[in-house]
């Protein structure tokens, strides 16, 4: 459900993550300090820009790429990265394409990437860095140790944010069962959920860039977040105005800047509450989030429950017969819902103590 703002970048990072044959070849060139220019793609549009060089048409190998980079020209690889098509070639892109790069190699790489939409990699001889271009994207690959340090720092930050979110959500749980939740409590929980998910997105990019070396970070991340995003979406479904689409609201919240996310009044407007006091406005949940915590209750049954009772308190107050009348709920499931909500309430109240 997250908006993939940098989906293209993530795909690029996966191709050249540490441990991949392509990254091994790039690292070899970097260590040799020869510099290099590689283009990934074999479409007619790309091959039209290639002038001269040697037709290699050989299987890809990190050591082959390293040896071929000793020559001045560009190396053209097939789009599936299985073949080296040609080496020592000159790339001649449209010179009218604007670029803010300075070195000849990087200017060419930027223009070819913009003109063809292909991945072009420039390895600087003097600065000893690898720069990746694709369309309008430019990304400098960093050393694994730097990324690992940043990922660990982000995990520590995430841990603190998750602890705050848990406190906010636990408080909201208590208020929901007492039916005294305010708009302030709800938008605070939505805000905290989105803050956590933004850090998660950042860590996921680090994991992608680390490749094989990111497995431990990935395991720690999975342990920390569990069902944070799902709960955040259900929270929106519980409290947004009935005439609004929860998916559109979630996308809108994701599109907010960091400053806008801090504005609780702005968040309340997004879920449909305009010009009302946050602290004094009591709102009741529909029950999506709480009922979802009961084991073995299908989503279509939850939909039917909410459609019939409209509020969590009405579901809790309903008799077995009233629950049994809802489509998809028999006697056994009615008992499971009643007992499940009772156990949830007891557990939440015990956690408070």
Swiss-Prot record:
Q: Which residues form a coiled coil?
A: none
Supply the EC number(s).
Answer: 2.7.7.85
UniProt domain DAC: residue ranges: 6-144
Q: Which cofactor does it need?
A: Mg(2+)
Q: Which reaction does it catalyse?
A: 2 ATP = 3',3'-c-di-AMP + 2 diphosphate
The molecular function terms of the Gene Ontology recorded here are: adenylate cyclase activity; ATP binding; diadenylate cyclase activity; DNA binding
Q: Which UniProt keywords apply?
A: ATP-binding, DNA damage, DNA repair, DNA-binding, Magnesium, Nucleotide-binding, Nucleotidyltransferase, Transferase
- Binding positions (ATP): 73, 91, 104-108
Q: Which GO terms describe its biological process?
A: DNA repair
**SUPFAM superfamilies hit by this protein:** RuvA domain 2-like, YojJ-like
Q: Which domain of life is it from?
A: Bacteria
* HAMAP family linked to this entry: DisA (MF_01438)
Q: What does this protein do?
A: Participates in a DNA-damage check-point that is active prior to asymmetric division when DNA is damaged. DisA forms globular foci that rapidly scan along the chromosomes during sporulation, searching for lesions. When a lesion is present, DisA pauses at the lesion site. This triggers a cellular response that culminates in a temporary block in sporulation initiation. Also has diadenylate cyclase activity, catalyzing the condensation of 2 ATP molecules into cyclic di-AMP (c-di-AMP). c-di-AMP acts as a signaling molecule that couples DNA integrity with progression of sporulation. The rise in c-di-AMP level generated by DisA while scanning the chromosome, operates as a positive signal that advances sporulation; upon encountering a lesion, the DisA focus arrests at the damaged site and halts c-di-AMP synthesis.
Q: Which family does it belong to?
A: Belongs to the DisA family.
NCBIfam families named in the record: PRK13482.1
Subunit organization: Homooctamer.
Query: Protein name, please?
Result: DNA integrity scanning protein DisA
Source organism: Clostridium botulinum (strain Hall / ATCC 3502 / NCTC 13319 / Type A)
Question: Lineage, please?
Answer: Bacteria, Bacillati, Bacillota, Clostridia, Eubacteriales
Gene that this polypeptide is encoded by: disA
């Amino acid at each position: 459900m997250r908006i993939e703002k940098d989906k293209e970048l993530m795909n690029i990072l996966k191709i050249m993550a540490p441990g991949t044959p392509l990254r091994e070849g790039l690292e070899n060139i970097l260590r040799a300090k020869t510099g290099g220019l590689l283009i990934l793609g074999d479409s007619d549009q790309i091959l039209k820009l290639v002038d001269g060089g040697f037709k290699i048409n050989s299987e890809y190998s990190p050591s082959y790429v390293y040896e071929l980079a000793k020559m001045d020209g560009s190396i053209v690889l097939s789009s599936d990265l299985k073949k080296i098509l040609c080496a020592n070639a000159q790339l001649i892109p449209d010179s009218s394409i604007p670029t803010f790069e300075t070195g000849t190699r990087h200017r060419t790489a930027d223009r070819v990437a913009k003109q063809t939409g292909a991945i072009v990699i420039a390895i600087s001889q003097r600065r000893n860095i690898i720069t990746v271009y694709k369309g309008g994207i430019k990304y400098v690959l960093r050393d694994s140790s730097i990324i690992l340090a940043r990922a660990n720092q982000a995990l520590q930050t995430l841990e603190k944010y998750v602890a705050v979110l848990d406190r906010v959500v636990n408080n909201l749980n208590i208020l929901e069962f007492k039916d005294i939740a305010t708009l302030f409590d709800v938008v605070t929980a939505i805000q905290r959920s989105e803050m956590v998910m933004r850090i998660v997105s950042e860590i996921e990019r680090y994991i992608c860039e680390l490749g094989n070396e990111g497995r431990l970070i990935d395991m720690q991340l999975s342990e920390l977040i569990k069902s944070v995003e799902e709960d955040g979406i259900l929270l929106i479904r519980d409290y947004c105005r009935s005439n609004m689409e929860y998916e559109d609201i979630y996308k809108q919240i994701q599109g907010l800047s960091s400053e806008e996310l801090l504005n609780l009044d702005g968040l309340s407007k997004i879920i449909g509450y305009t010009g009302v006091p946050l602290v004094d406005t009591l709102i009741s949940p529909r029950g999506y989030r709480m009922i979802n915590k009961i084991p073995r209750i299908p989503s279509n049954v939850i939909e039917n429950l909410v459609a019939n009772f409209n509020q969590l308190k009405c579901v809790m107050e309903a008799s077995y017969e009233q629950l049994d009348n809802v489509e998809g709920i028999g006697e056994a499931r009615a008992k499971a819902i009643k007992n499940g909500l009772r156990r949830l309430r007891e557990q939440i109240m015990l956690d408070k103590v």
